[in-house]
Amino acid sequence: MTEDNSANLRALEALMDEFFSPATTNSRKAEIEKLLGSFSEQSTAWKDCLYFLTSTSNQYVCMFSLTTLETFIHQRWVGMFGADRAEIRTTLNRFLSEHHTTAPQFIRNKLVKLIVDIARSDWPHFYPEFFSQIMSLVAVGGSPSSVELGLTMLLTTSEELGTPREDISTSRAMELHKLMLAQLPSVSACLVRLLEAGLGREVSNSSSPSDSEDSDSMDTPPPPLTVSLPLSPASKDSAVLCLQVVAHLLSWAPASHCVSSRLIRTLFLYAALEVRSQVRSYLISG
């Protein structure tokens, strides 16, 4: 069976390379598309695609495998056996965890999208660990690559689950909305801690307020802060993603669920930092 899989993988790699070759004629591309389409329609194509995805270094094959898996997730998911769904879910998560620092961004983002699409159907009933996986990635003190991945997953989750498309039932859309609202206090607190860490604050579990505590009162002065210009590239990248997540959350969630005085203070600090950066650039250029 392994030899058959290897032979099929080599054949697929050759087909994909031929398809994207500038020397390939349109008629030949049409033939290849028909072959690939016939393969994708097979009921066991998902299992082959998991093998192809985890065994190739060919980006075309990776993307074809993910696109085929996307079809199963969108069109056949409910009718699949639970064990098969779990295998797809586990393999995609493991592959993303192992390759998110080396895979091209378009492949990484596709993986994130498929995992969130699975959660759209399975969370929390068959995929209870979905949100805890994301939150573990965005913990303060994690590696920049893990934080970036977690924030990308948070943004995609907000886009897909906070404002679900019309291709799911009304009851499921309402359930997802409620589930997302329940997660917002912890998400907001995490985003604030990441933004504060980017500005240089010493943030620790012992000194940070819990998500349930009302420790964001405007009467409580913020801890002292010293910001050096410019921000490090990692801090800047993390801050940009954090702010994108905050902006999208506010596009659908009530402000009372995700806005605290602590978040507002931090946003003002970033606004002031941007002004200082512009002034500094002007003085240097002048």
What kind of region is each of these model predictions?
Residues 1-46:
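N-terminal alpha-helical scaffolding segments that mark the starts
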Residues 5-9, 41-49, 84-100, 123-147, ...:
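Amphipathic alpha-helical segments within extended alpha-helical solenoids and repeat-rich scaffolds
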Residues 6-10, 39-44, 72-75, 159, ...:
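Alpha-helix capping and inter-helical loop/turn segments
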Residues 28-36, 64-73, 106-116, 145-161, ...:
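Amphipathic alpha-helical elements of HEAT/ARM-like alpha-solenoid repeat scaffolds that form extended
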Residues 42, 74-76, 117, 121, ...:
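Alpha-solenoid helical repeat scaffolds
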Residues 58-102, 109:
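Eukaryotic helix-linker segments that join adjacent hydrophobic helices
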Residues 205, 243-246, 251-264:
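Extended alpha-helical solenoid scaffold regions that build the rod-like backbones
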